[in-house]
Amino acid sequence: MKRLLLLGGNSYLIPYIKAAHELGVYVITCDYLPDNIAHKYSDEYCNISIVDKEAVLKAAKELKIDGIMSPATDPGVITCAYVGEKLGLPGCPYKSVDILQHKDKFRKYLTDHGYNVPKAKGYNNYEKALYDANFFNFPVIVKPTDSAGSKGVTKVENIEELKQAINHAFEASISKNIIIEEFIAQKGSSSDTDCFSINNELVFASFNCQYFDAKAVNPYVPAAYSWPSDMPDNIQRELRSEIQRLIKELNLGTSLYNVETRQGIDGKPYIMELSPRAGGNRLSEVLKIATGQDLIMNAIKAALGMPTDHLTDPDYHGAWAEYIIHSNKAGTYQGIHLDPEFEKNHIVEKDYWLQVGDRVDTFTGANRAIGTLIMKFDSHDEAAEAVQNMERYLKIRLLEDK
């Protein structure tokens, strides 16, 4: 029986555990929080911090694993590549993953290799970051180089706002490194979705529309998605070509990726992020429902050195959307009301994560979501209208904090 080590413990790991079990694989989950929900589904739990590369390597040797993954769990991606390379397991090269997972190194790589990239610079020192303020054209984005889920990210309109943003980013950074980059204003919607390569060939390239809630405490946390993308076909083709080039240059092999892209108002396509892991917010699960292609199962097969299925660029047959259920008020959860007609016509899957009486916090990050809706529509415009006006169809019942 093959043995698979999954780094992390949140609910996004559960589909991986279930898929691995379908293959007859023994699954071990690993993090330092034994009460995390994924550990209830795995065959074994290992209590180690996933950012401690040497400790995870030692455990992996003792556990005699055949594969390692860090699905939808950004802090574990570098550890996953490190352990995999040390043990000779399938996976992306550690050196390449180190570039992809550190925003300052990634921006430098893109610049050095002729990709479209915003003007950016990395810092490990508050004074130096502030001193360089005049190097940039505002607005800028200030963020940690090593965090995901919009933690520590601030859009800054002028120098006066920069001090607080720099402090905020340093506080959220594990390695105490931040990056300041010029903000790329987008034309249409940005894209945040999953892709797949086999033997350095990009075989499944998806693009979508990413939506945000301007009323949320943190307006940079994705609140919804729809497929297909509203980016022009020629921009999608150029982005696909550039993603393919990046995969080959970094020799990433066979892997699932979360990829963030956009078209700037300057008309140029930009790769904003490419991480060799699945995205959060159940993106690969939605893509399976929408396209019939199972990226999660194939990522597991790849991690274990098993042959993957034949994958092709997606055909959506209409429009699909995912809404991240969240609250902009804090309180005690009393339930969710969904418009019956809307549910009948559009809801393919609903997943509520709370019980009556549970705590609800404001939407400061992806970890404050309280469920998801997966929906089907006839057109992109219909999907976009729905996810941007979800208050018409969905009500969260709360006993609000006083």
Regions found by a protein language model. Give the residues of each.
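Short, conserved charged micro-motifs
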Residues: 55, 129, 162-164, 330-336, ...
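Phosphate-binding core of ATP-grasp and ATP-grasp-like enzymes
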Residues: 169-177, 184-228, 237-271, 275-283, ...
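ATP-binding N-terminal substructure of ATP-dependent carboxylate-amine bond-forming enzymes
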Residues: 1-95, 306-309, 318, 327, ...
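Active-site nucleotide/adenylate-binding loops and adjacent lid/helix of ATP-dependent enzymes
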Residues: 99-179, 199, 229-241, 245, ...
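Short, well-ordered beta-strand elements within core beta-sheets of diverse protein domains
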Residues: 154, 182, 227-228, 288, ...
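A structural supersecondary motif
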Residues: 257, 342-358
